[in-house]
Amino acid sequence: MALLAQQLSRWFNSVKLSSFIKATQVTKHSAGLGKNASAQALLSSDTCFLQWGIKTDRALFSWSSFQSANTTRRKSSTNSTLLPSVSEQPEKIPRLESELPLEELDDLPPLSPLQPVSEEEAIQIAAYSPLPLSSSTLADYVDHSETLQKLVQLGVDLSKIEKHPDVANLLLRLNFEKDIKQILLFLKDLGLEDNQLGPFLTKNYAIFSEDLENLKTRVAYLQSKNFSKTDIACMVKNAPFLLSFSVERLDNRLGFFQKELELSVKKTRDLVVRLPRLLTGSLEPVKENMKVYRLELGFKHNEIQHMVTKIPKMLTANKRKLTETFDYVHNVMNIPHHIIVKFPQVFNTRVFKIKERHLFLAYLGKAQYDPAKPNYVSLDKFVSFPDEVFCKEIAKASVNDFEKFLKTL
């Protein structure tokens, strides 16, 4: 038994010596990394080996564990004298930005992504959200697009533009300085104010796909028709799509209204300045209303001409509303055509409001609309006055009386 223990002790010591020799070779190979690192690597390797050996042979040699442990400590103590002390003062590492030569920077190992950073460095790290590959809203791209950021600052409503995917994709491809800035300067030259650019671009988002020279050509055409700069600015503001129409189409529209209504050039120009969407909207409602005035309501051509030049919206008004208003004013209130022609603004008034006021005047015995008789009630004042003035000037009653009467209807 003593012989067996002696043989095992020699075997264990030979294994330790082999480990030490290998560790010494590793130390020589890693000398460029520094003495401390070599010592730590060797000690770590040796410790791992010892732990493995202890874990494997504990059951077999438990009777000699105490003796082996003492032998191991003596060997470790002897071997440690051959290695640099771990407790030695570490060498000073040169600062990269000042002491390390530039030609040696390429030889430095790359920084590990797991390397700890200080709080100051962490604050300076900019974290950007990833750009979505696809999205149904432009809001996801605002942080990544200077163009969208500038448009938002101008007051453009991106939620309305994103309903049109083709236009939304176009905006994402445009460069603000190269593609959009020149159009903004062009609109400013036309007379649009800064606070008007956002609403304009929200409605006519397609202007970004227009060639700037074509836009200038259309403005030049309007100027050739004696539209002033103020007129053009007003028309563009109230009908944003105006500049998207070709010169040929603009010319055809002006010709249509001049011919259909038999207006002079000046009256035609005044008509479209007051309602510029006549040049951009559909002509079908206009043609339909012209037939209604002539065939259903019984107005003469010159009467229609007079009314639409005074109230241009009559050309695009809802057909049903027109007929209901005329029916009540003409057949219930007994107002003839020639008086309606003088006060066409009655067609801009809600039928419900006309009914309420007429019934209140009839209740008071003051519903008299014939200018040739006493106590005449002007149709103009009848529809244009607010309730307070209507009650005081026309009905000669209080607003409270008017409200009480309305509750009885």
Curated annotation (Swiss-Prot):
GO BP term, example: mitochondrial ribosome assembly
Region (Disordered): 74-93
Record keyword Transcription present: yes
Cross-referenced InterPro entries: MTERF, MTERF_sf
GO MF annotations, alphabetized: transcription cis-regulatory region binding
SMART domains from the UniProt entry: Mterf
Keywords assigned by UniProt, alphabetized: Mitochondrion, Ribosome biogenesis, Transcription, Transcription regulation, Transit peptide
GO CC annotation terms, alphabetical: mitochondrial matrix; mitochondrion
Cellular compartment(s): Mitochondrion
Presequence boundaries: 1-64
Source domain of life: Eukaryota
Domain notes: Contains seven structural repeats of about 35 residues, where each repeat contains three helices. The repeats form a superhelical structure with a solenoid shape.
Annotated function: Binds promoter DNA and regulates initiation of transcription. Required for normal mitochondrial transcription and translation, and for normal assembly of mitochondrial respiratory complexes. Required for normal mitochondrial function. Maintains 16S rRNA levels and functions in mitochondrial ribosome assembly by regulating the biogenesis of the 39S ribosomal subunit.
Family label: Belongs to the mTERF family.
Name the UniProt record assigns to this protein: Transcription termination factor 3, mitochondrial
Gene label: Mterf3
